[in-house]
Amino acid sequence: MADNLVIVESPAKAKTIEKYLGKRYKVIASMGHVRDLPRSQMGVDTEDNYEPKYITIRGKGPVVKDLKKHAKKAKKIFLASDPDREGEAIAWHLSKILELEDSKENRVVFNEITKDAVKDSFKHPRGIEMDLVDAQQARRILDRLVGYNISPVLWKKVKKGLSAGRVQSVALRLVIDRENEIRNFKPEEYWSIEGEFRYKKSKFTAKFLHYKNKPYKLNNKDDVQRITEALNGDQFEITNVNRKEKTRYPAHPFTTSTLQQEAARKLNFKARKTMMLAQQLYEGIDLKRQGTVGLITYMRTDSTRISTSAKSEAQQYINDKYGEQYVSQRKSSGKQGDQDAHEAIRPTSTMRTPDDMKAFLTRDQHRLYKLIWERFVASQMAPAILDTVALDVTQNDIKFRANGQTIKFKGFMTLYVEAKDDKENDKENKLPQLDKGDKVTATKIEPAQHFTQPPPRYTEARLVKTLEELKIGRPSTYAPTIDTIQKRNYVKLESKRFIPTELGEIVYEQVKEYFPEIIDVEFTVNMETLLDKIAEGDMNWRKVIGDFYNSFKQDVERAESEMEKIEIKDEPAGEDCEVCGSPMVIKMGRYGKFMACSNFPDCRNTKAIVKTIGVTCPKCNEGDVVERKSKKNRIFYGCSRYPECDFISWDKPVGRDCPKCHHYLVNKKKGKSSQVVCSNCDYEEEVQK
């Protein structure tokens, strides 16, 4: 008979932990938060020292009833929610609902869901840390005060359904500021000169560097001509050889932010998908005979620290697999996070290799686990040693430079290289063995015109990185923030980069005009610092909120009285309604744009926006092939005559038949390339870069 009750957030976590604890423990799930501020009202009493009015979340009544039923039967109750501020707040809300004593040591935390870690945590229960709870409460109340005051103003003055929040408004600002930089950018001309040189049977390239021992800018064609006219023949001399040994160290194990960035670059995962998969790996995977095991440590962390035991196990694995020379000699275990003394995201055991785990994981789970495992193991490997050489190739005071690099010892690069490095610094560039005074022959001198480029738009990975660098938000907020600005139609993704929409820019301009603090980066960073101080017990949460709200409410009053009403006109669709004959307009819905009758609400006719690709349906030969989106936002191709014709393809038909079997050909993406292949047989054409 179980006389100990353990409460966790999710059924998956409950199932894993119950197997470890045995028959004397009953483990049940709260299904996340059980209490929150009400949706129908502010829920914060600004006249009573910002007292929050928590209620049971709608739909959670049966869960709470079940929790209370089990709590009555239990001799002892343990609250085992996640080891962060959010988890601490969930534990506190549970203790209030179950009427547990505040002084009770009933809180258990573990950074990984393995048998040893879970059992050990139950030997050291503690009380609920109210400083962590207060930091989470303060964040929640601040966000509620901002959202519930600004949003109604935007509904009244701009459009219903809009919102503005502390972190999402700054994220939107970053996207818009970058777009304005691009709009205002004026390209500037510049030139380069590249020379191809021969030494014996070897060829190498070098770039123009100096004229008369000084940097010389090539701003236009005249500058280039001045250099090329000063050259006399094709003989050059090696005037300097600089050989160095360069050490490259591996990256630290993942934090939440770096995991989201690397998964976006290497696996093409969105931040939300990365966190969903990481949660599954953390909460437990059924390994059949080995039972259910959490494969990675807690995935919401800003720490790169690792435990001594994890470090030792990884080094033992490296020694056995690669040899002693591949084991790192560095003593540092990484930085401790700003929020808590968590560990980095790592495998719970290095010995559970990606190959061994493949049979138990879905394809995407395995890809993410492999990324986490390789990054962690590589972080404990020896640095790579590179031999670099710089050659100065000179004639008539005109200097070209060639840079070469070869890998002397691969070290960690045997296993893993960061995505951002793949394109640039890791390629070997061998130069011939040359010494000062050697003569080389120029076979080509090629000037090239260039123009400066504007800064690139944000990818999801770069936006996450920038939010982290600016210290805006927390590990748990990056993915929801990016989700929110997309769902509100404030930004859109084009070629995997964020572009602000007209609506996003209108909302931003209003918030900037009337609520300047909300979109101010420095203000948002300072607020995060104050939340950290609350968590550390150095600040009172009510004072922090009071100081903010006293000035904020004046901004709200000014906006209500001074903000002018903005009319956002619907974009004409270019066709008439087939029901009533009124013009159709383009609207934005939950799943993207659609056509609706301008005579709404008298006429409620709507139509999907169909994008044809200029190819006749290969199945019925009557309809057109159109681009559609699945519920998961994945593009697929179907027939415009659906449901009469049920043609469907994930790959884009090209409008030609296979010369071998006469089935239709499709354009299949392969990384950054694409290839025309047959949908039925093995026919394929050359890869298109």
Swiss-Prot record:
It catalyses: ATP-independent breakage of single-stranded DNA, followed by passage and rejoining. SMART domains: TOP1Ac, TOP1Bc, TOPRIM. The keyword Metal-binding applies. It holds the Pfam family Toprim. A zinc finger (C4-type) spans 577-603, 617-645, 658-681. Residues 3-113 form the Toprim domain. SUPFAM superfamilies: Prokaryotic type I DNA topoisomerase (SSF56712). Residues 129-557 form the Topo IA-type catalytic domain. The record marks H33, R139, R140, D143, Y148, W155, R300, R488 as: Interaction with DNA. It comes from the Bacteria. The active site is at Y298. One of its GO terms (cellular component) is chromosome. Releases the supercoiling and torsional tension of DNA, which is introduced during the DNA replication and transcription, by transiently cleaving and rejoining one strand of the DNA duplex. Introduces a single-strand break via transesterification at a target site in duplex DNA. The scissile phosphodiester is attacked by the catalytic tyrosine of the enzyme, resulting in the formation of a DNA-(5'-phosphotyrosyl)-enzyme intermediate and the expulsion of a 3'-OH DNA strand. The free DNA strand then undergoes passage around the unbroken strand, thus removing DNA supercoils. Monomer. This is DNA topoisomerase 1. It comes from Staphylococcus epidermidis (strain ATCC 35984 / DSM 28319 / BCRC 17069 / CCUG 31568 / BM 3577 / RP62A). The gene is topA.
